């Protein structure tokens, strides 16, 4: 039982960490490409900005889903009931 809970805690840490890391890398690439495109064609900057904010909103969903899964493993672990 203790090993299951400790492995669940490790899994929660990995889920939250990787979700945050992936989002940070995604935001860095998104911002860099936006600045690159706006510098190359300044007249396209407003259209690129709208698309950038849409993609940024979708990128924010990744850590939110990871947090929900981590909270599920933390407070309502589905594997504890299978121990019998």
Curated annotation (Swiss-Prot):
Instruction: Give the signal peptide, or none.
Output: none
Pfam family of the protein (one): ATP-synt_C
Query: Subcellular location, in the record's words?
Result: Cell inner membrane
| UniProtKB keywords | ATP synthesis, Cell inner membrane, Cell membrane, CF(0), Hydrogen ion transport, Ion transport, Lipid-binding, Membrane, Transmembrane, Transmembrane helix, Transport
Site annotation Reversibly protonated during proton transport: residues: 60
What membrane topology does the annotation report for this chain?
Answer: Multi-pass membrane protein
Where, by residue number, does the polypeptide cross the bilayer? 10-30, 53-73
Q: Which InterPro entries match?
A: ATP_synth_csu_bac/chlpt, ATP_synth_F0_csu, ATP_synth_F0_csu_DDCD_BS, ATP_synth_F0_csu_sf, ATPase_proteolipid_c-like_dom, F/V-ATP_Csub_sf
* Major subcellular site: membrane
Please list the GO terms describing molecular function: lipid binding; proton-transporting ATP synthase activity, rotational mechanism
User: What's one GO-annotated cellular component?
Assistant: proton-transporting ATP synthase complex
Role description: F(1)F(0) ATP synthase produces ATP from ADP in the presence of a proton or sodium gradient. F-type ATPases consist of two structural domains, F(1) containing the extramembraneous catalytic core and F(0) containing the membrane proton channel, linked together by a central stalk and a peripheral stalk. During catalysis, ATP synthesis in the catalytic domain of F(1) is coupled via a rotary mechanism of the central stalk subunits to proton translocation. Key component of the F(0) channel; it plays a direct role in translocation across the membrane. A homomeric c-ring of between 10-14 subunits forms the central stalk rotor element with the F(1) delta and epsilon subunits.
Q: Which HAMAP family match?
A: ATP_synth_c_bact (MF_01396)
User: Anything else of interest in the record?
Assistant: Dicyclohexylcarbodiimide (DCDD) binding to the active aspartate residue inhibits ATPase in vitro.
In which family does this protein belong, per the annotation? Belongs to the ATPase C chain family.
Q: How does it assemble?
A: F-type ATPases have 2 components, F(1) - the catalytic core - and F(0) - the membrane proton channel. F(1) has five subunits: alpha(3), beta(3), gamma(1), delta(1), epsilon(1). F(0) has three main subunits: a(1), b(2) and c(10-14). The alpha and beta chains form an alternating ring which encloses part of the gamma chain. F(1) is attached to F(0) by a central stalk formed by the gamma and epsilon chains, while a peripheral stalk is formed by the delta and b chains.
Query: Under which name does UniProt file this protein?
Result: ATP synthase subunit c
Q: Which organism is it from?
A: Vibrio parahaemolyticus serotype O3:K6 (strain RIMD 2210633)
The gene name reads: atpE
